[in-house]
Amino acid sequence: FNFEDLSRIPDYPNKNFIDSDDIKNLKDGEVYKYWEKSQKIILQNRKAKFLKTHNILGSINGIPFTKPDYTLGVIHIVRDPRNVITSIKNHFDFESYEKAFQYMVSKDAFLKGEDSARFSFLGTWSSHYKSWMSINPQRRITIKYEDMENNTYDTFKRVISYTNKILGIKKDINNDKLLKAISSTSFEKLSLGEKEGKFKENVFNNNNEKIKFFNMGPENKWKNVLPKDIAHKMNNYYKDDLNKLNY
């Protein structure tokens, strides 16, 4: 793995997928108008393309984020919300866990990048994961973040088997390559690479200071990190979701 490889799976949406004339008049929150147009353009070369997104699988003003005709398959990653909150607090530089929690339960939550094309509608944490899990399992694989940490080899082997299936690849999985991929993407190596300036996707706080992306890693365990009142609130608020996801 090299950090340069991250650019091979670009964020969607972003300005590279939208016509330059459309970009000129684009305002925050209006990128949904170009979802379908941009996805039709992506499909023109008839080659499978991997994209990553934070967007909820839903509609804005009657316009769906994507359609089955434009999506070969989905690798959906879900994470315990009690650990998500720590990452959100760090990423947005929130001053308290309470503010991070209010962000997670807001139906109007969004992510905005450096321009109006990089705008993702999130919704609540609960509605977000449910939206992606509504996809037919034949077109989707759902992976728990915790399984990537605790059962790394088998989890990533499942992902490769899934991508091979939807792409029609019949080759056996190369276990040596898989083990090397896992080794080269350990949290320790990714964190070191970020420290050395190899990671290019950091955000900055209000003081223009770079916020660490590979922040806590395996140390982000809610039982050891969250204030008791927030842990209690989240256990109650997400009780049904936690049971559904076996957390």
Where are these regions (language model features)?
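An amphipathic alpha-helix signature
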Residues: 82-85, 153-160, 175-179, 231-235
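Polar, surface-exposed loop/tail segments
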Residues: 172-186
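Short, solvent-exposed coil/turn elements at secondary-structure transition points
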Residues: 56, 80, 146-148, 184-187
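A generic structural signal for secondary-structure junctions
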Residues: 89-93, 164, 186
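PAPS/PAP-binding and catalytic site of the sulfotransferase fold
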Residues: 1, 142-169, 181, 189-190
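PAPS-dependent sulfotransferase catalytic domain
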Residues: 1-143, 169, 208-247
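Short acidic/His-enriched helical or mixed secondary-structure segments at domain edges of catalytic enzymes
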Residues: 182-209
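Short, compositionally biased low-complexity segments
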Residues: 153-157, 201-214
